[in-house]
């Protein structure tokens, strides 16, 4: 009698699991629609949060990639002329920030630095001590970054925290300057 009473429970569990796996697998069209919906949520969030005091960044959709938003953060920073901010939505349900410091009219680049090894060590050390991680892209340009997964929904408050964290990155560019310019730079 106990065996018969477990049979319906097992069947019900298998049915639930098969439905869950069927809903998790998206068709390419559904995946693209979800990515477009995420882009529109991100567009609205950047439009609402960008003008706020402490953020003060005006984003626009990239001409090169329709799933990227770009902006320049300028003013009030003693070590950088600006930060170029790129916010992108990937094919893999993530939103990524790449924040490039503009120093002396150009990107900070590990290959062009006077002390490339020292700069790379500094980037690794900053990644250990900062909210945002530091890295270099395929061309050697240095950036601060953060990546959100969308598994638990759209992270609107967390994205705003990253936006508030952009201007304070200037202090870390100041710590990189001796490696970029050489030991006499301060």
Spans of model-derived segments:
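Short, internal acidic amphipathic alpha-helical interface segments
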Residues: 28, 49, 98-141
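Short, highly charged C-terminal tails/helix-capping segments
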Residues: 177-186
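Charge-rich, low-complexity N-terminal segments
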Residues: 23-82
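A short, solvent-exposed beta-edge/loop patch
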Residues: 124-173
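A short acidic-to-branched-hydrophobic micro-motif
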Residues: 79-108
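Bacterial N-terminal signal peptides that target proteins for export
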Residues: 1-10
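A mature extracytoplasmic/lumenal domain signature
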Residues: 63, 89-91, 101-103, 138, ...
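Bacterial N-terminal signal peptides
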Residues: 9-18
């Amino acid at each position: 009698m106990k065996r018969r009473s477990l049979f319906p429970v097992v069947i019900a569990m298998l049915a639930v699991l098969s439905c869950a796996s069927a809903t998790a697998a998206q068709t390419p069209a559904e995946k693209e629609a979800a990515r477009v919906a995420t882009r529109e949520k991100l567009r609205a969030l950047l439009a609402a949060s960008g003008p706020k005091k402490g953020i003060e960044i005006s984003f626009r959709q990239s001409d090169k990639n329709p799933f990227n938003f770009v902006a320049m953060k300028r003013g009030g920073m003693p070590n950088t002329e600006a930060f170029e901010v790129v916010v992108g939505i990937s094919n893999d349900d993530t939103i990524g920030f790449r924040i490039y410091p503009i120093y002396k009219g150009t990107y900070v680049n590990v290959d062009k630095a006077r002390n490339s090894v020292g700069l790379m060590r500094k980037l690794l050390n900053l990644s250990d001590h900062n909210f945002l991680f530091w890295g270099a892209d395929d061309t050697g340009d240095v950036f601060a970054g953060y990546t959100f997964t969308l598994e638990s929904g759209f992270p609107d408050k967390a994205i705003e925290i990253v936006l508030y964290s952009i201007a304070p990155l200037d202090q870390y560019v100041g710590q990189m300057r001796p490696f970029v310019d050489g030991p006499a730079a301060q």
